[in-house]
Amino acid sequence: MIQVLLVTICLAAFPYQGSSIILESGNVNDYEVVYPRKVIALSEGAAQQKYEDTMQYEFKVNGEPVVLHLEKNKGLFAKDYSETHYSPDGTRITTYPSVEDHCYYQGRIHNDADSTASISACNGLKGHFKLQGETYFIEPMKLPDSEAHAVFKYENIEKEDESPKMCGVTETNWESDEPIKKVSQLNLNHEIKRHVDIVVVVDSRFCTKHSNDLEVIRKFVHEVVNAIIESYKYMHFGISLVNLETWCNGDLINVQEDSYETLKAFGKWRESDLIKHVNHSNAQFLMDMKFIKNIIGKAYLDSICDPERSVGIVQNYHGITLNVAAIMAHEMGHNLGVRHDGEYCTCYGSSECIMSSHISDPPSKYFSNCSYYQFWKYIENQNPQCILNKPLRTVSIPVSGNEHLEAGKECDCSSPENPCCDAATCKLRPGAQCGEGLCCEQCKFSRAGKICRIPRGDMPDDRCTGQSADCPRYHSHA
């Protein structure tokens, strides 16, 4: 039986003794101290992973109880994820760390339909969530023998420079006199999954800011990509991190205050160097550099599959992952054919969306109706081949912990909310034909002939058989 645990809340009645990242900077002027408690146990029969597939926590915000539902982001890492750094003599060193049982989650607040959450549970709960229209952060506090966390609003973070910051891409606005077209007018084939594997490179200044601590840098970037994925899922577009490269022993290009020169140099380096080592479709350069003209990011337009131009550069704006994620999602949007929003563009009733030319405060996590139309128009017209192949398997572990289900189990019963699978018995629910797979839709086998995978090269498309949830390889069709 699942037991619900009560939560004890303690407002800050004791001296502050340090916390993590943002609070440690001393730039937060008001916060609550809370003690989150897990309120849902691992379902029966689930594997004993260190980080469960689904979790639920309860705490209070402004005196009101909050229940945070979390689900592991199984698509965060590509199946061949790697990390690269350089020795002092310039030797390239690449490792392949195990990221199967990772600690990055997305979620929502119970009874708040507009809520979102992007959380890491690596060492306590750290990240941000949207509650009743306001953006909050949560971080573990460094208090001896304590589970204390700090919760604070984005608006309570003091920023060094409040002047408007902007994207360096110019003359790209949505034409204000152009009617907002409906996506239904486009001839889209949503049966074909679009997905991109990205590389994130960090410069030497970013390393210095984080004391050259690769573990801290790694977690920062993972949190950023986790948040970006949340924004792009509303575009029906998948993103996975395939490589993290750190330049802590010196930059491999000339990083300048001129954003265009830095973008150009990074693109040339990607074409001449990075592409030879890592199979990917897009690269983003994260820097602790302040560009001239209040620019915080820049990218090439309509360039997602170009060896030199499928890149963007991103400033470590205020050192906040939410800000960095918004900028990186914005610059990737330009690579994917999306322009800046015009005056008639909205997202959930707001005019402050990801593709606004200036970053909002707090930054938006949503693309506008204009962005959605432009993105899919670009996909339809250009049909960029490098994003058509979703990885055959992103990192995720079935409940049994094996590639295949254990004997006697018909489906992955790790989530009690799976509509196809009975979590108590690991059997398919009555009427269900399947629980997951490229050819499984709403618990039924997909129709025969549906395209389920587009292979690279000249091989024909892989198609569902109508008799299985698996997507067979072409050579097995005959």
UniProtKB/Swiss-Prot annotation:
Binds 1 zinc ion per subunit. Residues 21-188, 392-407, 476-478 form a propeptide. Its cofactor is Zn(2+). This is Zinc metalloproteinase/disintegrin. Monomeric (disintegrin). It comes from the Eukaryota. Residues 1-20 form the signal peptide. A motif (Cell attachment site) lies at residues 456-458. Glycans are attached at residues 279, 369. The keyword Chaperone does not apply. Belongs to the venom metalloproteinase (M12B) family. P-II subfamily. P-IIa sub-subfamily. GO terms for biological process: proteolysis. One of its GO terms (cellular component) is plasma membrane. CDD domains: ZnMc_adamalysin_II_like. Disulfide bonds join 207-248, 305-386, 345-370, 347-353, 411-426, 413-421, 420-443, 434-440, 439-464, 452-471. Residues 194-391 form the Peptidase M12B domain. The active site is at residue 331. Zn(2+) binds at residues 330, 334, 340. Transmembrane segments: none annotated. Glycans are composed of 4 GlcNAc, 3 Man, 2 Gal, 2 NeuAC and 1 Fuc residue. Pfam families: Disintegrin, Pep_M12B_propep, Reprolysin. SUPFAM superfamilies: Blood coagulation inhibitor (disintegrin), Metalloproteases ('zincins'), catalytic domain. Keywords: Cell adhesion impairing toxin, Disulfide bond, Glycoprotein, Hemostasis impairing toxin, Hydrolase, Metal-binding, Metalloprotease, Platelet aggregation inhibiting toxin, Protease, Secreted, Signal, Toxin, Zinc, Zymogen. Its EC number is 3.4.24.-. It is an enzyme of class 3 (hydrolase).
